[in-house]
Amino acid sequence: MPLRIRPVVTLAVLAAIAGCGTPAARPDLARWEAALGRPATIDWKREQRLEESFVTPDFTARLYRQRTGPRTEQRVLLMIPHGLRGRAPGVVVPFYDPDRMCGYDLRSKTPLGPERNSAKFGLHLVRQGYVVAAAESYPYNVLTEQEVAKAPSGFGVWRLAADKLARTDPDLTGMGKLTHDARRAMDLLAEAPEADPSRLAYMGHSLGGKTSFYAGALDLRARAVVASDFGIGWDSTNWQDAWYFGARLKGMRAAGLEHGDLLACMAPRGFFLIAGQYDGEQSRPQLDRAREAYVAAGADAEALRMFDHKSGHQPSFESLRAAYRWLASRLGRPEPDLAFLSELERQQASAPKR
């Protein structure tokens, strides 16, 4: 029988449970909740269906399609390590589609080219023994295939999705939709028999980094977040675009909302920022803004980290090695064997430049 979704836990409740922030900062929590917005309907049947199972040289997979609301669905690729015994830590990896995170074209089941090997987080994680939920994100799970095909070039898909979301869920921002749907992917992962529900995390790049940051801050099931070059400062990237916060951002900034305050709500849970282009030294004030909360929560010195590879938007392999060692320590795993990254790095370096 399909399960029924319960209303999303409010930030104020999460604050009380997690002890996040100081009393003076708690009024900001309600403003974060208001900023993200709420779906028009919160009482809907949770349904998921298994579309297919398959095996690749790197992992065993189950592709699900599940509801994220009364009118929207998402594809979630559950990636299981070969030879898994017992339960393993799990990581949700949100992005435009599962393909680019798992490293395979899901239609043909053939490997993707090596040009973006460093961003194939799902593939990296499953090779280390994690159970991974590679989740499809807004805007592609808001529009039909026909709507995507008819969208103008450039940012047409994004604008079309933002317009549609404004009609169907007028209070919900694009960032709110991204966050909500990532948490539904975490529902699926936490219920998977292969995953250890006490050792869960989010990891994402760019849009996936934004999503992982917000979902991880809200979701107490997540013990850690790794976010790559998403632009933690308001002026670092396009937070003002209609598909993130749109016109609502101006009021948020006027009210004094800063991401360092949202990060403080994660304390003492772990946060690792991979910086490269949109994050860097300009991001440190946000981490410093949260540091007092981490100290007050008794977090260890490694709980809040940034690695700035200074080599552009794509993560460097050096930064990934640091992030994966850190993640293993946060989720109670031994030092990971990352030798496979060297081969991926070699392949990427040898790939024709586009």
Pin down the residues of each PLM region.
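Mobile cap/lid helix-loop segments that gate and shape the active-site cleft of serine hydrolases
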Residues: A161-A162, D169, R184, R223-L263, ...
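Cap/lid segment of the alpha/beta-hydrolase catalytic domain
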Residues: R87, P94-R183, E191, W234-Q240
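Glycine-rich nucleophile elbow surrounding the catalytic serine of serine-hydrolase chemistry
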Residues: G204-Y214
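Alpha/beta-hydrolase fold nucleophile elbow
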Residues: E194-S206
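Bacterial N-terminal signal peptides that target proteins for export
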Residues: M1-V9
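Proline/glycine-enriched tight loop/beta-turn segments at coil->beta junctions
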Residues: G69-Q74, H82-V91, D97-R100
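Alpha/beta-hydrolase-fold serine-hydrolase catalytic core, especially in secreted/extracellular enzymes
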Residues: P23-E73, H82, R269-R354
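Bacterial Sec-dependent signal peptides at the C-terminal "C-region" and cleavage site
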Residues: A12-A25
